[in-house]
Design a protein with these regions (language model features):
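N-terminal glycine-rich phosphate/adenylate-binding segment common to multiple enzyme folds
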Residues: 51, 55-64, 73
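Short, contiguous strand/loop micro-motifs
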Residues: 10, 36-39, 104, 133-135
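A short, well-structured juxtamembrane/interface segment
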Residues: 40-55
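Glycine-rich phosphate-binding loops that contact phosphosugars or nucleotide phosphates
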Residues: 63, 67-154
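Cofactor-/ligand-binding subdomain signature composed of acidic, glycine-rich
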Residues: 1-37
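Short secondary-structure boundary/capping elements
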Residues: 15-19, 44, 109-116
Length: 154
């Protein structure tokens, strides 16, 4: 039987029946899974970073592309690069499906607009030194465009 990830059984079923302590312990247990998953992924992350760094040293940038909450977190992370690391705001760019409106309000079906996602990359003059990181499953659709000439009209 196919179960959507968002509909799988979780620690958050029946929240109304749990004590505050149980809820807090469940949240903490889920948070610990992030560190364990990251630890397992370090070899793949290392490989990715070792490929990105040389391109960035040649002027490449990172583009985070996402939808909904994932897109918002990408924009937030990109906005923290200048004050945290003293880097220019053009080094890591967060793009969210639905544009700036989607930062505060839901923009229904924005993640399905593959043309607009690619147009935003073209507007930023994306090139072969840049890296595009999709941070939501629905972003995969816009990544089909780079297989074509770098023009959203083709």
């Amino acid at each position: 039987m196919f179960i959507k990830i968002s509909e799988q059984p979780s620690l958050y079923n029946d929240l109304e029946k749990k004590s505050i302590r149980e809820i807090l312990e469940d949240i903490n247990a889920e948070d610990q899974k992030v560190a364990l998953a990251t630890q397992k992924a370090i070899p793949q992350i290392e490989k990715l970073v070792s490929q990105i760094v040389p391109r960035m040293k040649q002027g490449g940038r990172i583009f985070y592309m996402g939808a909904g909450t994932s897109g918002r977190l990408g924009v937030l992370d990109a906005s923290e690069i200048p004050p945290t690391f003293g880097m220019p705001p053009t080094l890591v760019i967060g793009l969210i499906a639905g544009g700036d409106t989607a930062l505060r309000n839901p923009v229904e079906n924005a993640e399905d607009d593959t043309r607009r996602g690619w147009e935003e990359l073209v507007e930023h003059h994306i090139n072969d030194k840049d890296t595009v990181i999709g941070i939501a499953a629905s972003v995969i659709r816009i990544l089909q465009w780079p297989r074509k000439p770098m023009s959203p009209s083709k």
